[in-house]
């Protein structure tokens, strides 16, 4: 029995009336076990094993996993709605891009009409200018040829005429001079002959006289030489120079002037040129190209959204990803919940067995009631605290370590920690879904990036088809011009060559007719051949070159006439920010932004939940750190001695003996320890530490003494039953 001095109880019996000395009094008597109500094995005021196992299906971890599953289901439902909205926006944006692309791909249809008109007008003016230029060239060439022929013919006709006339004049002068000399010579010779004959006649006349005198006067007559008449006849001979040069004078009058050759050549050369001019004028004089023969590019209706199932397939893939993730989590999380139920069931069975064992130990021995309650309610964390505290030798540190573990594993702290883990696990599940969606997003971006390429490819194809058809028309016109106009030029050059050959033949005939039987024939022929024929051959070579190269090559349309600008824009040559100039910033932003919004929204939700879960985890860490700091501070405080009112922390484990007073030598009497039975040691004995009294704080309560003990100044030492 105990009493309180302040309540007016009967004071204790003085010590001098006690048979034993105070040394024999056990200041810490064995605790008196309190009787408890009788309980049947099947009817108890507490939950038995079956009752506890019946509540395993809604244990803490299962409930948290179910909450995570509910969060995932809510997320997938929201994702399906968001993906549906994104699909609608993407299809709308894709349709807009499709309309823009169709309009751009149809631009050749509208541009080709103007290009055809411009090309037709250019061809008309080109042909008209070519006709005018050809007419001027033909006229110029014709007159140039005639000028050269006239120059050659006139020059050499004058040279030949001068040569002939000069030769004839020389011949006439020579004949006249020779005739005069001969006539003068005949008169002189006749006079000299007459004088000589007169002298001879005088001599002959003296001969008879001499002979007569010599013969004595015989007279005889000698015949007289009379040649006077003959000399008169000889003197009367006159050479007429006119008769001698009559043929030469007649030849001089018959020298040709080549007018016939010139006129013939002029008429012959004019024939092909006039024919060519008439053909050119009749065919291309009023030429106008018909632009209707040019093709018109067809309109293009791009359908990379309408007929292309990529977008639908992409979003169906996203729906399938969400559906698969939903099914996976609906399967995995319940499995984890079942495993949690199984694990918690196993732990509950172990806890039940451990509680039954400890209840017997707690019943058979005296322990700190609070420690008993704690170890009974928290066997796992309490056991972990016992295991960890056994590593320290100081009893106080052992108590503080156990207190720290108990503080950090209290129900509120573990509730915060479980919420943090559940939130992080939920974020992990959402992150898995996010990564699955992000993995599919680049495929959409790549496909959208190809839309611009599809437009440019269509433009290129349309441009190529139109250019091929238009170039076919131009090539046909080019062939017509080469076959008609320049074919006539070829014919004209051939005719001119033939005419020049005829001209050469006519000149040769004229020279032959004039100089055939004269000594000037070869000279005149060689002179004309050197000065005229070789020049004609040179002109013929030029006409042959014209004949071989008389064709025109019209410029053709390039295959990228309508797509070059678009292609340059896609390749980055344009500074414009347009569908083609920057497809990544326009097309991708228009279409993929819908998916990016879903991803961004999901990311923001994950980040928010992760921050909340991290905040809860930090709260738990702060709680643990505050408990650890409090334990460290308590461990560092200087302890009071027992005489100063200090506290005794705990007792030795059951079965271990405390040392007795050295002076008494009686091992059965202890001042501060209980007598305990050494039988049936528990796991607490092996750990070397048990319960321990609580560290006192606050205002101390009234002191108590046993009714059989005298009042003493020693403070009462609390036993484990207090």
Curated annotation (Swiss-Prot):
Glycosylated positions are: 252, 263, 281, 307, 491, 497, 567
**Which stretches of this protein does UniProt put in the Extracellular compartment?**
1-60, 165-326, 435-604
Q: Where in the cell is it found?
A: Cell membrane
Domain of life (superkingdom)? Eukaryota
Q: Which GO terms describe its biological process?
A: plasma membrane fusion involved in cytogamy
Q: Where is the composition biased (Low complexity)?
A: 655-667
Q: Where are the transmembrane segments?
A: 61-81, 144-164, 327-347, 414-434, 605-625
Instruction: Provide Cytoplasmic-side residue ranges.
Output: 82-143, 348-413, 626-722
Membrane topology (UniProt):
Multi-pass membrane protein
Question: Which InterPro entries would you find in this protein's record?
Answer: PRM1 (IPR026777)
**GO annotations of cellular component type:** mating projection tip; plasma membrane
Keywords carried by this UniProt record:
Cell membrane, Conjugation, Glycoprotein, Membrane, Transmembrane, Transmembrane helix
In residue numbers, the region (Disordered) covers 636-722
The UniProt similarity line reads: Belongs to the PRM1 family.
Could you tell me what this protein does?
A: Involved in cell fusion during mating by stabilizing the plasma membrane fusion event.
Protein known as: Plasma membrane fusion protein PRM1
Q: Name the species this protein comes from.
A: Chaetomium globosum (strain ATCC 6205 / CBS 148.51 / DSM 1962 / NBRC 6347 / NRRL 1970)
């Amino acid at each position: 029995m105990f009493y309180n001095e302040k309540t007016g109880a009967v004071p204790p019996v003085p010590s001098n009336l006690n048979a034993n000395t105070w040394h024999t009094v056990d200041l810490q008597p064995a605790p008196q076990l309190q009787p408890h109500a009788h309980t049947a094995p099947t009817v108890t005021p507490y939950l038995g094993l079956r009752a506890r196992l019946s509540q395993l299906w809604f244990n803490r971890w299962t409930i948290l996993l179910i909450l995570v599953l509910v969060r995932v289901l809510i997320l997938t439902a929201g994702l399906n709605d968001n993906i549906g909205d994104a699909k609608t926006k993407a299809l709308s944006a894709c349709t807009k891009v499709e309309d823009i692309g169709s309009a751009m791909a149809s631009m050749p249809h509208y541009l080709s009409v103007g290009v055809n008109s411009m090309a037709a007008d250019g061809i008309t003016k080109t042909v008209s200018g070519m006709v005018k230029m050809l007419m001027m060239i033909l006229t110029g060439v014709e007159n140039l040829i005639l000028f050269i022929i006239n120059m050659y013919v006139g020059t050499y006709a004058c040279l030949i005429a001068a040569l002939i006339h000069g030769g004839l004049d020389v011949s006439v002068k020579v004949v006249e001079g020779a005739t005069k000399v001969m006539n003068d010579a005949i008169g002189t010779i006749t006079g000299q002959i007459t004088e000589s004959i007169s002298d001879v006649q005088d001599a002959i006349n003296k001969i008879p006289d001499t002979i007569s005198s010599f013969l004595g006067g015989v007279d005889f007559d000698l015949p007289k030489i009379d040649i006077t008449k003959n000399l008169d006849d000889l003197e009367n001979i006159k050479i007429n120079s006119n008769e001698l040069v009559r043929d030469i004078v007649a030849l001089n009058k018959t020298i040709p002037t080549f007018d016939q050759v010139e006129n013939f050549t002029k008429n012959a050369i004019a024939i092909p040129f006039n024919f060519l001019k008439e053909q050119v004028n009749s065919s291309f004089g009023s030429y106008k190209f018909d632009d209707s023969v040019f093709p018109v590019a067809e309109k293009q209706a791009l359908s990379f959204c309408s007929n292309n199932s990529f977008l639908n397939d992409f979003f169906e893939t996203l729906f399938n990803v969400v559906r698969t993730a939903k099914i996976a989590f609906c399967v995995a999380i319940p499995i984890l919940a079942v495993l949690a139920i199984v694990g918690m069931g196993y732990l509950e069975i172990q806890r039940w067995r451990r509680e039954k064992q400890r209840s017997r130990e707690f019943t058979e021995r005296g322990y700190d009631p609070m420690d008993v309650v704690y170890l009974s309610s928290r066997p796992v964390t309490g056991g972990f605290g016992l295991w960890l505290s056994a590593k320290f030798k100081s009893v106080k540190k052992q108590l503080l370590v156990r207190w720290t573990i108990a503080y950090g594993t209290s129900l509120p702290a573990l509730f915060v920690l479980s919420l943090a883990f559940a939130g992080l696990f939920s974020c992990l599940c959402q992150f898995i879904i996010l990564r699955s969606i992000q993995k599919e997003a680049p495929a959409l971006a790549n496909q959208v990036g190809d839309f611009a390429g599809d437009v440019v490819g269509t433009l290129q194809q349309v441009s190529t088809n139109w250019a091929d058809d238009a170039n076919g028309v131009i090539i046909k016109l080019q062939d017509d011009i080469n076959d008609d106009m320049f074919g006539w030029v070829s014919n004209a050059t051939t005719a001119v060559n033939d005419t020049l050959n005829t001209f050469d033949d006519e000149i040769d005939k004229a020279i032959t007719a004039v100089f055939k039987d004269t000594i000037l024939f070869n000279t005149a022929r060689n002179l004309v051949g050197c000065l005229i024929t070789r020049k004609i051959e040179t002109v013929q070579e030029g006409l042959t070159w014209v004949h071989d190269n008389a064709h025109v090559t019209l410029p053709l349309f390039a295959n990228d006439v309508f797509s070059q600008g678009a292609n340059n824009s896609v390749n980055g040559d344009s500074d414009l920010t347009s569908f083609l100039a920057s497809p990544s910033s326009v097309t991708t932003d228009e279409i993929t932004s819908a998916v990016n919004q879903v991803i961004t929204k999901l990311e923001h939700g994950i980040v928010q939940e992760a921050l909340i879960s991290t905040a809860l985890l930090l709260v738990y860490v702060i709680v643990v750190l505050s408990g650890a700091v409090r334990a460290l501070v308590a461990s560092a405080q200087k302890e009071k001695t027992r005489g100063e009112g200090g506290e005794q922390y705990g007792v030795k484990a059951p079965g271990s003996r405390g040392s007795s007073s050295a002076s008494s030598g009686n091992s059965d009497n202890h001042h501060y320890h209980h007598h305990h039975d050494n039988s049936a040691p528990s796991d607490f004995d092996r750990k070397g530490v048990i319960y321990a009294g609580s560290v006192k704080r606050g205002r101390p309560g009234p002191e108590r003494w046993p009714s059989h003990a005298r009042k003493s100044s020693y403070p009462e030492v609390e036993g484990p039953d207090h």
